[in-house]
Amino acid sequence: MGDNKNNGDSGKLLYCSFCGKSQHEVRKLIAGPSVYVCDECVELCNDIIREEIKEISPKRDNDKLPTPHELRAHLDDYVIGQDRAKKVLSVAVYNHYKRLKNSSPKDGVELGKSNILLIGPTGSGKTLLAETLARSLNVPFTMADATTLTEAGYVGEDVENIIQKLLQKCDYDVEKAQRGIVYIDEIDKISRKSDNPSITRDVSGEGVQQALLKLIEGTVAAVPPQGGRKHPQQEFLQVDTSKILFICGGAFAGLEKVIEQRAHVGSGIGFGAQVKGEKDKATISETLSQVEPGDLVKYGLIPEFIGRLPVVATLTELDEEALVQILSEPKNALTKQYNALFEMEGVELEFREDALKAIAHKAMSRKTGARGLRSIVEGILLDTMYDIPSIDGVVKAVVDESVVNGESAPILIYERNETQVASGEQ
């Protein structure tokens, strides 16, 4: 019988030398010198090797933790301004991963989680800060939109789906996922509709806050290995969310009025009160920097939820000068990205200073912050990017203020020193 198993003569059945299955029981049988191995055994060996690599890799990842100064320097490379927020984030993130490295309590002192709440206007860099931190630490990162979340059992996305997305980002490696960062955007949109608890269910407001509580604080979430609930017999993955850093962000429109109302209570009215002039009035950013937990409760976040986000950082509204810097200075600046695209066609792209200022001015007037810069630049260069692959001899394209304002098309410079306005201007 043993001779038959390894006999490759025609008419004889071949068997896997490892599991003993015949060639008819498996999809593929791979031959070696006097031995055979089936596809199932190969897959099993791969799984064993992958598991061993998983056990080793987290230890390697944890060897060197960047200091707050190093984290801040990395943020400076990609994010313009927001100095205070960068410092707060760098310290909070450093403390979080220091806590993970020293997980055994010393003298019975257990370190709490330092989840973060970012408050700032649209396009001020909240998402970019969180994403850049995850990249600098080489940890998995995922984003969720709070407005799409609902309580379990209601139509919408369950909060547990956030962990599912994080697992997908690291190929369902639970150890890696547990060291990841989750950014939940539009968190202000799940504030409850009034200060008074309602007898009706608020499934997309307070209900979601309640559902997020345990996840953010730390619980063991059961997640299906490949998503969905189609296979009840599948063994669920157990993910400890106490090791995951949660960063929540929102614009919190109108919060400054709540803060001002609190600040002005007891400031005096009548003839003896001091009247503040226009110059004495704080900007929205300055007012938001004075936020207190009570203000967030009045805004509509429940006290328990605020308690799970002990680190609060406020971001300032970007001015025109900051937007000009964002366009050209960061490592991943928009102008550098479009330069790279044009270089692939053998064309140099030049943005003149007046063009950068005009783009920034347009973004300011649209009130979109840095988020609106890409759509403006894309609109300016669309026709040129459409035409250049079909035009021979172009070596340079120049964008100035008139191009941004729609008065002319980018200037194209040819190899023979001929200058011509790009198509679109007759």
Curated annotation (Swiss-Prot):
HAMAP family: ClpX. Belongs to the ClpX chaperone family. Residues 4-57 form the ClpX-type ZB domain. GO terms for cellular component: HslUV protease complex. Zn(2+) binds at C16, C19, C38, C41. ATP-dependent specificity component of the Clp protease. It directs the protease to specific substrates. Can perform chaperone functions in the absence of ClpP. The keyword Membrane does not apply. The keyword Zinc applies. It comes from the Bacteria. It comes from Shewanella oneidensis (strain ATCC 700550 / JCM 31522 / CIP 106686 / LMG 19005 / NCIMB 14063 / MR-1). InterPro entries: AAA+_ATPase (IPR003593), ATP-dep_Clp_protease_ClpX (IPR050052), ATPase_AAA_core (IPR003959), Clp_ATPase_C (IPR019489), Clp_protease_ATP-bd_su_ClpX (IPR004487), ClpX_bact (IPR046425), P-loop_NTPase (IPR027417), Znf_CppX_C4 (IPR010603). This is ATP-dependent Clp protease ATP-binding subunit ClpX. ATP binds at P121, T122, G123, S124, G125, K126, T127, L128.
